[in-house]
Amino acid sequence: MKKIKKLFCICIMLTFVASCAKPTISFTNDEIELINKYSQQKMRVLIYNNENDSLILRQQTKEFSNTDLQSDIFENLKIQMLLTVQDTSNAGVGIAAPQVGISRRLIAVQRFDKVDEPFEFYANAYIVYYSDEKRIGSEGCLSIPNLRGNVERSETIVVKYIDTETLKPLTDTVSGFTSVIFQHEVDHLDGILYIDKLHPDV
């Protein structure tokens, strides 16, 4: 009986210690090394016709945990993605984490539908609604330099994501050109490039 009580107490203690342990981030060592390598500088953009780069660009990305979103590594990634997409030598209107070698569900989108047209980050982003109303427009991509093509997109979408500050799940309804940016960037998170969707009639 004493042995059973002792074992029970040990189990309780182990459970308590485990519950108090600090959660660990899910970033891989390779991801951490790549993010730290650039140390708050712009990152190298992966190119679609580079064989090694293409392997990453075509991957299905992984979600972040809440612990990831609260980490310094995540903050550094955001800073460096922003520096990359705003690089005056090759500026863009959106960027996805896979484009800088990080296969995670994170995008930055320039919100042309908001005052001052800010760049905003969306973690674990998914599009949960596509309108039947479509639009055809010319698109380019930082990962596909010196090329453009016409793509059909929904006029309005609803994007679901995690707010990187509050960690709350949110949705946002977006229309017009900004919705096109969202669709383009979320495609990156699923290993899809705009050249996969070129409109045949234009």
Segments (PLM) and residue ranges:
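Bacterial N-terminal signal peptides that target proteins for export
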Residues: M1-F8
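Positively charged
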Residues: C20-V202
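Hydrophobic h-region of N-terminal signal peptides that target proteins for export
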Residues: M13-S19
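Enrichment for repetitive, rod-forming helical segments
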Residues: I10-M13, F112
